[in-house]
Amino acid sequence: MSTQFSLSSNISYDDPISFECDTSYDSGLELLKYIIQVTLLSINFILNFLIIRVTMFSKNNDFRENSFFIIYAADLIMGMYMSLSEILVGRLFIYVTLLCPILAPYFFTPSIFLKIFFTLSHYSQGFKTVSQVFLSFNRMTCVVFPVGYSAIWKRILTPIIIVLFVLPIGIIWNVLISRVYANPSFGGFSVNYIKLVSWASLSKLHLTYFIVSLILIIVISGVTLYALLILKHRIKSAEQTLTIATMVLSLEFSFLSVIQIYFAFFSSSTSEWRPFLLRVMYFTYDLLNFSTTIIFISCNPKLRKMLLKRMQSSVTVGRSTSNSTIPVRIIPALIH
């Protein structure tokens, strides 16, 4: 049975919001979609965990004391949260349709659990957006100011970490004061909200962050690439890596911006596109998390060697880090 869902215009904060689950979806097919997505999310979670383990918990201090990897570790931890929360809550509620009639009634009234999940989901998305700018900026300073790089970041790292954690609040502040509720989504249910401040929609706020971040990443990466090109001894592998990383991020941010434009300005008038674009948005966020991790590993032989040795459990991390001839300080300038 396909169901229609709409909210009353005069609903209060505490009123129950009930719905019937859409039983027209094939539960087996939806479960298969869940398994495929969970597989990708799980791989990303494991890779992020391994990177943190071999960089931040190794016997070698090069990674732990490097400003780039400190910022990147925060980015990885946020990526791990995004993957885990989607596996255990977000995608589970949407695609495991047999759970919908069992669990949905528990969320017809205001739920602290849903509010925390929804708020942290959008906070982490905003965090990932902002972190890419600071990682790009770190790479740029390493190339442009090679002598003073360490001293510069010793002074500004703490303020930047604080700003990194504070800026995403600019996306979720309206959610914090608004009603969060469950609504039918595909064969299961997802989480939405009733805006208390009508103009401050999540889609518009995300769109603003995407556009500003995209512009900054392109400008910063352009400066970095130019600085690499004018080096007396050019590092062509670094130039190629930086170009690829910038292109991938730019395409993903541009794609997410287009989707947010739809949700911000056209969703109500062309609702037949909404289910499709929701799926595309979920996939694009997964791809953003996964692609940055893969690019980072594939373009960093030092880290790749450490990960392989860690997984093989054949040598210690400390010994594996001693084989590289490239100073770790240069790594942030070369890859992400």
From Swiss-Prot:
Membrane topology: Multi-pass membrane protein
Residues spanning the membrane: 32-52, 68-88, 93-113, 133-153, 156-176, 210-230, 246-266, 277-297
GO-annotated biological processes: sensory perception of chemical stimulus
Gene3D superfamilies, per the entry: Rhodopsin 7-helix transmembrane proteins
Origin: domain of life: Eukaryota
Pfam families registered for this protein in UniProt: Srg
Record's GO cellular component terms: membrane
SUPFAM superfamilies for the chain: Family A G protein-coupled receptor-like
Transmembrane helix listed as a keyword: yes
Subcellular location: Membrane
Keywords: Membrane, Transmembrane, Transmembrane helix
Transmembrane helix is among the record's keywords: yes
GO molecular function: transmembrane signaling receptor activity
Family affiliation: Belongs to the nematode receptor-like protein srg family.
Protein known as: Serpentine receptor class gamma-13
Gene: srg-13
